[in-house]
């Protein structure tokens, strides 16, 4: 357990310092060694996103959401990755899921409203955002 914390925490520190390349290396190792660590996958996905590796970010964040499906933060970040990858419909569903889990999650609400306003034809007229 201590090894897990040290390994994942090291990757998180590197990420927060903006050293995304090193963070990816540490977090990839942590995610292989500790496949049940949602934190390793969340930060790995975020580091990939910072590198512009949006498909890799989606994969890591999807794994994080499988481990911890009730996290609105993970669904919001997954929505951000889908949006950056040019997959707005999936982004919309992830933002919506984040709001279902936490109706007061302002970032997810703002992202959902923004996406809905920018892409009305793609998303269809039946999509509603609760006020």
Locate the predicted segments by residue:
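Structural signature of tandem alpha-helical TPR/SEL1-like repeats
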Residues: 16-29, 50-63, 84-97, 119-131
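Mid-chain, well-packed structural core segment of small domains
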Residues: 66-86
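Helix-start (N-cap) detector for alpha-helical repeat units in TPR-like alpha-solenoids
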Residues: 3-4, 38-39, 72-73, 106-107
């Amino acid at each position: 357990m201590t090894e897990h914390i040290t390994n994942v925490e090291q990757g998180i520190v590197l990420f927060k310092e903006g050293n995304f390349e090193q963070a990816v290396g540490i977090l990839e190792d942590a995610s292989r060694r500790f496949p049940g660590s949602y934190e390793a996958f969340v930060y790995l996905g975020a580091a990939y996103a910072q590198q512009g590796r949006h498909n890799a970010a989606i994969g890591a964040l999807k794994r994080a959401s499988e481990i911890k499906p009730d996290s609105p933060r993970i669904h919001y970040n997954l929505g951000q990755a889908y949006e950056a990858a040019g997959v707005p419909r999936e982004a919309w569903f992830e933002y919506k899921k984040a709001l279902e889990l936490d109706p007061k999650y302002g970032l997810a609400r703002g992202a959902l409203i923004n996406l809905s306003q920018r892409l009305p034809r793609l998303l269809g007229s039946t999509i509603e955002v609760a006020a």
